[in-house]
């Protein structure tokens, strides 16, 4: 299976561990960054993971930031993406089996690596169980998506990147 993975600078080490775990399971990993601990922002990488999944380049996605909240929100803004921020096995399975989630998100400072491994494995193995009710609910969710020209704009985050390049952000 092809799995896109992305993170912000706070949890690059966790992302690399998850990436290695996925590769050891035989999955092809599409790592969209970030690749080091240089300060950056989660929306860039949530969007990139979402785009890989929505385009079909990846079957599923994994997003990780400090809490998981921001990066999951960013990924969810990509049309066709249903991201679940999970902190337990029940939520992970429910999101895939009932809501047909295609991206799972974590807080790397909230959940430990071994726990993330278990949830990612279960999420990948779980299968969507379509019912008339959940198909209708998913269709309603999909109807909420409206095209926005910024979604396809590769320069959407340039103003922030310019500030980072000038050293205006500090941890």
Curated annotation (Swiss-Prot):
Give the enzyme's EC designation: 5.3.1.26
Q: In which pathway does it act?
A: Carbohydrate metabolism; D-galactose 6-phosphate degradation; D-tagatose 6-phosphate from D-galactose 6-phosphate: step 1/1
Question: Which NCBIfam families does this chain map to?
Answer: lacB, PRK05571.1, PRK08622.1, rpiB_lacA_lacB
Catalyses which reaction? aldehydo-D-galactose 6-phosphate = keto-D-tagatose 6-phosphate
Tell me the GO molecular function terms.
Answer: galactose-6-phosphate isomerase activity; ribose-5-phosphate isomerase activity
Gene behind this protein: lacB
How is the quaternary structure described? Heteromultimeric protein consisting of LacA and LacB.
Which BP terms from GO are recorded? D-allose catabolic process; galactose catabolic process; lactose catabolic process via tagatose-6-phosphate; pentose-phosphate shunt, non-oxidative branch
This one is known as Galactose-6-phosphate isomerase subunit LacB
Instruction: Give one Pfam hit by family name.
Output: LacAB_rpiB
Which family is this protein grouped under? Belongs to the LacAB/RpiB family.
Q: Which UniProt keywords apply?
A: Isomerase, Lactose metabolism
